[in-house]
A protein has these predicted regions:
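ATP-dependent phospho-/nucleotidyl transfer catalytic cores
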Residues: 110-211
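Sec-exported extracytoplasmic/periplasmic mature domains
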Residues: 77-83, 186, 209-213
Length: 213
């Protein structure tokens, strides 16, 4: 997160053109996002409370890193079944007038994503996979395999947590969400006390359908 550089974004749909100030950095946890030096993966933040394609933060990556057309079709089905999912589509990219070609644009997790699909702003949490990627890199170096810890050992992260202020409603909601997920991972509370059973079942079914293809 310390590697951001300033940039200017120019977008066009063939009729109208837009310009916006932004910050950009390399992204990717795995070699497939950095292997092709011509199609590097980038995380992009639009500055000055502006938006591009209705988004304030998104990524671009080579389509093959996400299974080409599989990912947008998978996410489209999620939204059709009323499961919140990031917007994802293909764009023709140039960097400093150098033609990069078709890249996949993926919306980042924030309140704009939630509210654009009828949800209310609230905590967005996830299991932090940083340990997994670090261990996989070590496995490649050492010629080993597997992970030396269990699923319940992983830390939990909050997207855009902001400054920690104990008295604020936002901090209390973040802590409550993290506590519920941690209690589930530790086997203290059942899934139906943490997750929306109907939406979680739809997410599980769709994920298994597409990951089996």
């Amino acid at each position: 997160d310390d590697d951001w550089v300033k940039a200017t974004l120019l977008t066009s749909n063939g009729k109208d053109a837009r310009k916006a100030k932004a910050e950009i950095r390399l992204k990717g946890d795995w070699a497939d996002q950095l292997r092709d030096s011509h199609k590097l993966s980038f995380r992009i933040k639009v500055r000055n409370n502006d938006k591009i394609f209705g988004m304030s933060k998104f990524s671009i990556q080579a389509p093959k890193t996400r299974g080409n057309h599989n990912e947008p079709l998978f996410l489209d089905m999620m939204r059709m079944m009323d499961v919140i999912a990031p917007r994802y589509f293909f764009v023709d990219v140039r960097i400093n007038d150098m033609k990069i070609g078709i890249m996949a644009l993926e919306e980042h997790f924030n309140k704009i994503l939630i509210e654009s699909q009828g949800g209310r702003e609230g905590p967005i949490i996830a299991i932090d996979e940083d340990w997994i990627w670090r261990q996989r890199h070590l496995n490649i170096i050492d010629g080993t395999s597997g992970l030396p810890y269990e699923y319940r050992d992983y830390p939990i992260k909050v997207f855009k947590a902001g400054k920690f202020s104990p008295g604020t409603i936002r901090t209390q909601h973040n802590m409550r969400a993290m506590s519920l997920l941690r209690d589930f991972m530790d086997g203290i509370v059942p899934a139906n006390e943490v997750f929306d059973a109907d939406k979680t079942s739809r997410w599980w079914i769709i994920s298994n359908i597409w990951h089996a293809l």
